[in-house]
Amino acid sequence: MSIKSDKWIRRMAQESGMIEPFEPGQVRQSADGQKIVSYGTSSYGYDIRCAREFKVFTNIYSTVVDPKNFDEKSFVDIESDVCIIPPNSFALARTMEYFRIPRNVLTICLGKSTYARCGIIVNVTPFEPEWEGYVTLEFSNTTPLPAKIYAGEGCAQVLFFESDEVCETSYRDRGGKYQGQTGVTLPKT
């Protein structure tokens, strides 16, 4: 299994629709010249962007967080260019990009250091072979202060690994529960 380069990522995105919309280069400034958290193709990965759709964790109803019986009232829905995450809390978001992962590819998604250096941790599970959809992102604010996330800017990097042999059973074959997700998706069992 080997990590894939910028040339491979560009080819797969442009010929197979692996990433849509796709940015073939690295964007570091907004259209009006403002500095932003970079996104797009890097040497050995792709920096994904956060969309304007957020679910911010709240303790208004004092419910228990149970992954087997998750209460949607635990979140407040926000649509904005920025999301403020309360101290020691977290938020869910989704990528602007839609992914179609090939059958012989597995990805690993890592947070960007720009956010990590501010105490904001991004967690995303691997994108399995033949998974497709918008990625649900998990942001944890580990600080005692409110933290800001920017929509339309880079938030994490996806690394692509191509296997020497095709898997016997893909995510699609298993009927994976998060297949084809279109928005921020809460836990399913």
From Swiss-Prot:
Q: Which SUPFAM superfamilies match?
A: dUTPase-like
What are the record keywords, sorted? Answer: Hydrolase, Nucleotide metabolism, Nucleotide-binding
**Which pathway, per its entry?**
Pyrimidine metabolism; dUMP biosynthesis; dUMP from dCTP (dUTP route): step 1/2
* Active site, UniProt feature: 138 (proton donor/acceptor)
Q: What superkingdom heads the lineage?
A: Bacteria
In terms of InterPro entries, this protein maps to: dCTP_deaminase, dUTPase-like_sf, dUTPase_trimeric
**E.C. numbers:** 3.5.4.13
The chemistry this enzyme catalyses reads: dCTP + H2O + H(+) = dUTP + NH4(+)
Give the UniProt record's GO annotations in the biological process aspect.
dUMP biosynthetic process; dUTP biosynthetic process; nucleobase-containing small molecule interconversion
Query: Which GO-annotated molecular functions does the record name?
Result: dCTP deaminase activity; nucleotide binding
Q: Which family does it belong to?
A: Belongs to the dCTP deaminase family.
What's this chain's function?
Catalyzes the deamination of dCTP to dUTP.
What is the recorded name of this protein? dCTP deaminase
Species name for this entry?
Leptothrix cholodnii (strain ATCC 51168 / LMG 8142 / SP-6)
